[in-house]
Amino acid sequence: MELDDILDAGRGDRLFLLGNEAAVRAAIESGVGVASTYPGTPSSEIGNVLSKIAKRAGIYFEFSINEKVALEVAAAAAASGVRSFTFMKHVGLNVASDSFMSVAYTGVRAGMVVLSADDPSMFSSQNEQDNRHYARLAWVPLLEPSNPQEILEYMNHAFELSEEYRIPVLLRTTTRVSHMRGVVEAGERRAEPVKGFFRKNPEQFVPVPATARVMRRELVEKMKKLKRVADTSELNRVLNEDSESDLGIIASGGAFNYVYDALQTLGLDVPVLKLGFTYPFPAGLVAEFLSGLEGVLVVEEVDSVMEKEVLAVATSEGLDVGVHGKLDGTLPEIYEYSEDIVRRAISGLTGIKSHEKGIEAPELPERPPALCPGCPHRAMYYSVRRAASELGIEGEDLIFPTDIGCYTLGIEPPYSAADYLLSMGSSVGTACGFSAATSQRIVSFIGDSTFFHAGIPPLINAVHNRQRFVLVILDNRTTAMTGGQPHPGLPVDGMGEEAPAISIEDITRACGVEFVETVNPMNIRRSSETIRRALQHESVAVVISRYPCMLSEGAVRGRPVRVDEEKCDLCLECLNELACPAIVEEDGRVFIDPLYCRGCTICLQICPAGAIKPEGKR
């Protein structure tokens, strides 16, 4: 499907969309004037699509420097009377949470929707946090769609809700909902202003203690009203309500899809309460659903959020109903669910056995993720190891704090260059801690986009507190891991327009770093020599490793190389030190697959026997 179809579709047109693409269509239909994000899987496709069509749609869109800024951009737009949409992966809401908590107090003048894409089973994340807790923490309404059509409908509804109650609305998706495809029926596009006007009202928008106390009281009153709305919301509905089964099921979000499929497989007619408006929790509706049931299965991903609410409702209403789910072991406490998992839980409660077998897949050899052929990070890892070894710094004497990005794959051998990781930017902050607490040497790795996102404040901290470590900024000219989005270091913005590029060299020097050098990582000799001097520097040293990602438009592809079998003595240094997917050992010989080789020449530079040569040379 062409991306323009998402923009140009008329009312009633049917589109086959990813969940994330449906979110873009919803933004267009709802009249969003400002959209913002920092890219992060599983939400990345929303920004990727918006960046291509926002200009035509009349939407201002930006890839912000981080999620906190993205949320603040959206909040200011909503305060100015312009509908806004900000979206991020689940851990991104941690970064934005300071301002997120406050915008719940100040409220909005136009609709504001915050989409959190959670990642059950941590397919591309460092934790499995359940961001439904944020709705409760911030006191904002929470909607949970189950498929692309619902993403469209729920987002449209969320903007109406946001404006009626002057409050931001949190929309929670999960990896499967974000990345599933489905037929979406387009609706009307709403005309909304793309330029607003901010009318000053410090009593509403400046939460100093005196005004914040008033805002807090108003927020409590809003939530009381929203609780009544949740109880009667059309987003909450009962399926199979005429069923005579004494077991019921309550489900939300992507978990509902597993329930639906499992019941189809089992051929069971069981009442199901599908919750789409899940906070404030619709306690009245749930109490009504529970009455007359002997047991209820609560199916949700990730934490037992609804299950605890259901238990509270059953207790407060004096209902003698068994509540099953994560807490009693009927369902797993962690990771994403599947139809098999939910079907087994239902079978266990009903005694009805399924004759369906789970999908039987052949056992495959493990294939850990790897850096791409020609990746400049591989070259820099080699140079760092080599330089440290030449100075006698090895093993436990050398700590490698790392960060979020492709280079996290440095954890894999032979690089083994990832010893500590917490979050975006933590490579720099934790280097400060290791420098203060140990006498070990430290080399931290951070990417270019991550440096802009969260690496600058801890670098200032390091200089001010006289810490000593080497910071390697891996500048591959893109936000690579999430799909190649731009960042402030590039001369282009989120809508493809020319923009000022911010120099990493200038920033690091402005932070007070005296040792700042830029290298081409594909030059092993020069890179190793620079790292060697950086390790000998008595304070913070920054080495910027600059070379374009091999998957980017600016990728450099050289002439493929080959192994001269007459010279190769099978020392296997190329294999053991680089782990490049293009280098293969087979039948007692080493060869380089020309389909994979990008001509980076790193293997050529490190071969002790000089047995690797460019194609065509003898």
UniProtKB/Swiss-Prot annotation:
Q: Which cofactor does it need?
A: [4Fe-4S] cluster
Give the catalysed reaction(s), semicolon-separated.
indole-3-pyruvate + 2 oxidized [2Fe-2S]-[ferredoxin] + CoA = (indol-3-yl)acetyl-CoA + 2 reduced [2Fe-2S]-[ferredoxin] + CO2 + H(+)
Per UniProt, the enzyme's principal EC class comes to oxidoreductase
Keywords of this entry: 4Fe-4S, Electron transport, Iron, Iron-sulfur, Metal-binding, Oxidoreductase, Repeat, Transport
The family database entries (Gene3D superfamilies) matched by this protein are listed as: 3.30.70.20, 3.40.50.920, 3.40.50.970
Tagged with keyword Cytoplasm = no
The family database entries (SUPFAM superfamilies) matched by this protein are listed as: 4Fe-4S ferredoxins, Thiamin diphosphate-binding fold (THDP-binding), TK C-terminal domain-like
Q: Name one GO molecular function term.
A: 4 iron, 4 sulfur cluster binding
Q: What is its EC number?
A: 1.2.7.8
Q: Which residues bind [4Fe-4S] cluster 2?
A: C580, C597, C600, C603
Spell out the PROSITE patterns in the cross-references. 4FE4S_FER_1 (PS00198), 4FE4S_FER_2 (PS51379)
InterPro entries given in the database record: 4Fe4S_Fe-S-bd (IPR017896), 4Fe4S_Fe_S_CS (IPR017900), HACL1-like (IPR045025), IorA (IPR017721), Pyrv_Fd/Flavodoxin_OxRdtase_N (IPR002880), THDP-binding (IPR029061), TPP_enzyme_TPP-bd (IPR011766), Transketo_C/PFOR_II (IPR009014)
Q: Where does [4Fe-4S] cluster 1 bind?
A: C568, C571, C574, C607
Cofactor binding annotation: Binds 2 [4Fe-4S] clusters. In this family the first cluster has a non-standard and varying [4Fe-4S] binding motif CX(2)CX(2)CX(4-5)CP.
Q: 4Fe-4S ferredoxin-type domain: which residues?
A: 559-590, 588-617
Could you tell me how activity relates to pH for this protein?
Optimum pH is 10.0.
| Entry's Gene Ontology BP terms | organic acid metabolic process; sulfur compound biosynthetic process
State the superkingdom: Archaea
- Described function: Catalyzes the ferredoxin-dependent oxidative decarboxylation of arylpyruvates.
Q: How does it assemble?
A: Heterodimer of the IorA and IorB subunits.
Q: What is this protein called?
A: Indolepyruvate oxidoreductase subunit IorA
Native organism: Methanothermobacter marburgensis (strain ATCC BAA-927 / DSM 2133 / JCM 14651 / NBRC 100331 / OCM 82 / Marburg) (Methanobacterium thermoautotrophicum)
Instruction: Recall the taxonomic lineage recorded for the source organism.
Output: Archaea, Methanobacteriati, Methanobacteriota, Methanomada group, Methanobacteria
